[in-house]
Regions:
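Positions that flank functional sites
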Residues: 32, 108, 131
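Acetyl-CoA-dependent GNAT
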Residues: 3-75, 86-88, 92, 96, ...
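Conserved acetyl-CoA-binding loop-helix of GNAT-fold acetyltransferases
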Residues: 78-92, 110, 114-118
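Conserved catalytic-core motifs of GNAT/GCN5-like acyltransferases
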Residues: 104, 117, 122-138
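Structured catalytic core of nucleotide-sugar glycosyltransferases
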Residues: 58, 92, 112, 124-126
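Conserved hydrophobic beta-strand within the GNAT/NAT acetyltransferase core sheet
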Residues: 67, 101-105
Length: 154
């Protein structure tokens, strides 16, 4: 996993973002802007050929964080890459004294919801029409407890 990203890494993240999220994808400029804040957590995962196959961007504000973007290359989903990436991210956020982590997930993305629930994220709200008029997002939250390692249940 890479936490020190070079320009070409950011370009690869933007390309993967575009392939995963189409019209809802963040621009290269938006991704770069999140890298400017040293408190934020941005991690990329590469395969054996230095291709970026996953990434996560979390914004830190005081003792809270929000996972803004999280993507795994389609053909690599279901292989534990997202689980590992989320675990490392939560550990890094904990080291930054973050107490609560929030994220939004599409109501129809059951696989992602199960992943988050395995890390003890709880549904705390809903944003109606967030992804489209008929597609809400669930707001989920996890409390990071001091002195414990982050574990996700399989």
């Amino acid at each position: 996993m890479k936490t020190f990203l070079k320009k070409e890494d950011i370009l690869k993240i933007a390309e993967l973002e575009a392939s995963l999220f189409k019209e809802r994808a963040w621009t290269l400029e938006l991704i770069e802007s999140e890298l400017e804040n040293p408190q934020n957590v941005v991690i990329a995962v590469e395969d054996d050929f230095s291709e970026i196959i996953g990434y996560i961007i979390a914004k830190v504000i005081l003792d809270e964080a929000e996972v803004l973007r999280f993507g795994i290359k389609k053909e690599r989903q279901g292989q534990g890459i997202g689980r590992g990436l989320l675990r490392v991210t939560l550990d890094m956020l904990k080291r930054k004294s973050v107490k609560k982590v929030f994220l939004e997930v599409s109501a129809d993305n059951i696989k992602a919801q199960r992943l988050y629930e395995s890390f003890d994220f709880k549904k705390v709200g809903e944003r109606r029409g967030y992804y489209s008029p008929d597609k809400p997002a669930f707001i989920m939250c996890k409390t990071l407890e001091e002195g414990s390692h982050v574990k996700g249940r399989d």
